[in-house]
A protein has these predicted regions:
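ATP-binding N-terminal substructure of ATP-dependent carboxylate-amine bond-forming enzymes
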Residues: 1-99
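Short acidic-hydrophobic, aromatic-tinged amphipathic segments that line or gate anion-handling sites
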Residues: 46-52, 128-134, 163-166
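Glycine-rich phosphate-binding loop signature in dinucleotide/nucleotide-binding domains
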Residues: 64-70, 143-146, 177-178
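Glycine-/Pro-rich loop/turn segments that contact NAD(P) or position catalytic residues
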Residues: 104-129, 134, 138-144
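ATP-grasp fold ATP-binding core
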Residues: 119, 142-160, 179-189
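Phosphate-binding site of ATP-dependent enzymes
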Residues: 163-198
């Protein structure tokens, strides 16, 4: 059984761990848009592909699946999860199982503010999050929230653009210069990331 791991980047240890769990007849094929992505070279075979935003990306991945007789596909980056999920039927049509949540779940998980609203609606205790500066400003002026805060892109991944802001004027400027940010109450403590593949 051959597996395709897309956008592998620096996650060589993850590929090594997957290889240990597979039988000797299984192969891991890896893709990335950057030929210097270290994790590529832990796989049994590598492909350099267009960026996920390229018009030819999906057809390139489909071609690899056919050529390498791929039975299951997944990705190591958040933005690509939704691409795989939305094209699940296309992959299933060539006998490839998409190892990703369904499109609705993928969309919800990728949009941090939608996820916040979902969690609040379900009664799950979560960090206070604002979808825009104006909402934050109202609470700030009413002393319902304080600085510092944590700002990050609403749909970002890999902590790109995420930062702590201590100053109100700096926050205001950032929010007016950069669109689609969320503002969260600052949570102090150890950061913990968990990736689960079942």
């Amino acid at each position: 059984m051959n597996f395709l791991f897309c956008s592998v980047g620096r996650r060589g240890e993850l590929i090594k761990n997957f290889k240990k769990s597979l039988n000797e007849d299984s192969k891991i094929i890896a893709t990335d848009c950057n030929n210097t992505a270290p994790a590529l070279y832990f796989a049994d075979k590598q492909y350099i592909v267009p960026k996920i935003t390229d018009d030819n990306y999906l057809s390139t991945i489909i071609d690899i699946c056919k050529k390498e007789e791929i039975k299951a596909i997944t990705t190591f980056i958040d933005p690509e999860i939704e691409i795989l999920a939305k094209n699940r039927k296309l992959f299933e049509g060539i006998g490839v199982e998409v190892l990703a949540p369904y499109a609705e779940t993928a969309s919800l998980c990728f949009d941090k503010f939608k996820m916040y609203e979902y969690l609040v609606d379900k009664g799950v205790k979560t960090v206070k999050t604002y979808g825009d500066f104006e909402s934050f400003r109202i609470d700030y002026e009413n002393e319902a929230c304080t600085l510092p805060v944590f700002v990050k892109p609403r749909t970002g991944s890999g902590s790109v653009g995420a930062r702590k802001i201590d100053n109100y004027e700096e926050l205001k400027g950032i929010c007016y210069n950069e669109r689609d940010l969320i503002i969260q109450e600052f949570m102090d403590g150890n950061d913990l990331d968990v990736d689960v593949y079942i």
